[in-house]
Amino acid sequence: MKILIRLHDILKGFEAFEFLPLFLIRLYLFYVLWFAGINKIESFNKFSGYLGTLGVPFPDIFTWLVIITEAGGAALILIGLFVRWSSIPLLVVMFFAGYLVHWQNGWPHEANGIEFAAIYSLMLLTLLCFGGGKYLSLDYWVSSNK
């Protein structure tokens, strides 16, 4: 029993690093979302046309909304500013991307399925619930200066 208590105490020491997983999620999502938004700028007409074929009204406007949401949200998530607020429109984009684009292809990402949209949604939901984390997030420093 003493061994289990000692192991528990050792594992409890990892609480000092509780900020790290949230920071790593933010870094990863920045990379994915930033380049998704930037690539849509480079292929604006192609993406807008694709949205039009899906029946999305005003595809040019929605293309800009997606670009701003992905690139702007990625930048805010990277620096840890308004992380919870940024997660909400990004979750909406992920929902519609998953439903309109990926759902009919099933789960596997190899078939352009919903797998990555679901994983990114879970990561964004984590940020929505827990925020950007301690120390490496501007939200933390802004809220601690009250």
Where is each model-derived feature located?
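Extended, low-polarity transmembrane helix blocks
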Residues: 1-42, 60-68, 72, 78-146
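Membrane-interface interhelical connector segments
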Residues: 42-58
